[in-house]
């Protein structure tokens, strides 16, 4: 069977940037585990705040965490109470000074993570898997997507044998490196077990900036 490479990992360094921006030698393993702990903690604390991407940058004894969210008001809280509480907890977790940046996602229907999360939550509320996928596809296309593909796999409708069923609209050129494709997978906990949700969204082409060579050529 043909396997698909991760669309984001394939484009890192070409049109996508890293989610963790730091360099370390001896401390690499410690920093990596710390990053995983930060991401896990933030996703648990802000499970209902539509947080998509968590970017982490490091300086000496300082950690900058950028949260991309569709609900910045929920993350900040009244008078900044929620974000202050989150910062204090992250300071305690890491033992370092943590600075939090909040970046609003203007079009959540073009964010694969949020679209997948929406489908998964609908499946948990017993919405038909075909309907959940088709509604998500319609919203994404209306929001300006050039193409979208979704897939739900597992014991669909409680069937004894697990299977995968997907829908797509428009084009999703997975092999084109300049294609801005957002990808995410989520899980839905249903009474029949877990269902996997995958979403690919093609948002148009991005031409990487030309690198200047010597002589100005």
Curated annotation (Swiss-Prot):
Q: Which GO terms describe its molecular function?
A: mRNA binding; rRNA binding; structural constituent of ribosome
Q: Which residue ranges does the record assign to the KH type-2 domain?
A: 38-106
Q: Which residues form a coiled coil?
A: none
The record's keywords, sorted A to Z, are:
Ribonucleoprotein, Ribosomal protein, RNA-binding, rRNA-binding
Q: Which residues form the signal peptide?
A: none
Record-linked CDD domains:
KH-II_30S_S3
Q: What is this protein called?
A: Small ribosomal subunit protein uS3
- Give the originating organism: Streptococcus pneumoniae serotype 4 (strain ATCC BAA-334 / TIGR4)
